[in-house]
Amino acid sequence: VTSPAGEPREVLIRPSASGALRSGMYDRRERLLREQVESTSEGKLGYLHIQAMGTPSLLEFERKLYAAGHGKDVLLIDVRDNGGGWTTDMVLSMLMVEDHAFTIPRGGGTGYPQGRRIFGTWDKPVVVLCNENSYSNAEIFSWAIKTLKRGPLVGKKTFGAVISTGGAGLLDGSLIRMPFRGWYVNNRDGTNMELNGCPPDHAVENLPGDYVLSRDRQLEKAINVGLSLVE
């Protein structure tokens, strides 16, 4: 390898494991989407993506809740391409907390609810993005946001793969998965979440050529919906 001046130079290339490469690509994409949201909305909207509904992503969500939401009026929460897990109710506990009292400390300063809540909270408007690659607990989260009227959903109908399963080992060493609990929406019809994906309030499809052009039509719509919620 030569330098711009034409002199030879030595370059050391360290290969990355596939997992580290995927993680880096994920972080880069989330950063670009966050920058797009903040730039397009002139700082009014925040953005964060939940990669999975498990403990690492839950802790990351709480951490990013402060960074993404600081000074913002509306938060875009993205569960597209989220394979699921089990943390919906913990995420909801950060998004649906109401103050039941107020305090007046001696000498002024902060009071309730500081130090009283398990998780950080966000009580301003939210817009949730979901798509056909949102599975299982990510679908339960989407249904919960819709059923509890916490905010509008944007994107595509979720996959419709919601059921609790366990497993049993066989004599040959293989494992068989077994369903043991069905999930139903707490609505008038008691909709079975299995085979019934959560329909968004604003259906938007990203076209095949959009990725090459770095265009995200679903995010564009979510930004417009979010701006309409700014007071």
Residue ranges and their predicted role:
Residues 105-110, 176-193:
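Short, basic, helix/turn surface patches
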Residues 20, 184-209:
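Active-site rim recognition segments
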Residues 1-174, 210-218, 224-229:
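Cleft-lining beta-strand/loop regions that shape enzyme active-site pockets
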